[in-house]
Amino acid sequence: MPTMFIETETTPNPATLKFLPGELVMSSGTRDFPDDEAAAASPLAAALFDLGDVSGVFYGRDFISVTAGPGVDWSQLKPQVVALLLDHFVTGMPLFNGPDASGIAVPADAGEEDDDPADAEIVAQIKELIETRVRPAVANDGGDIVYRGFREGVVYLTMQGACAGCPSSSATLKQGIESLLKHYVPEVLEVRAA
């Protein structure tokens, strides 16, 4: 049986740990499992929720973020999560059931049909900044950010993974992302969680 080591990193969200298996998790996109019902699409996510103390699972390109439920002691949960991840990656089990092979649970462009075609150039600038400046930083913290729309000067975004329940996520949206977008795209007046 091959030897494997899973690295663990803390995230700004104290309830979430980021697990790095040292190999590709998602070939494209990301996947958020905010509850056990959503996790039914993935045997690994379902097994993590079956531990009982897990309240969220998120797959990034080369990491898996696991969020513990309220009051859960990571010193007890972490070895169980690592054991499940090792078993999954060493045995080569599929990440998803059936045709649902990859990508995010909610398409990244969900809500874009509401974008005004007259704002196409502005929306393209916003998406470019999110893709090149924001997503890499958010992924580094064990999460992702998804564009949901631009209406009347307001950019709507969804935080996923470690970022979804993080106490500092609203500060990240307002002070970090909103400041960046307003600086480069003057038409942006505000950023809100969608």
Language-model segments: residues:
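Domain-level signature for proteins that mediate thiol-based redox and metal-cofactor handling
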Residues: 1-194
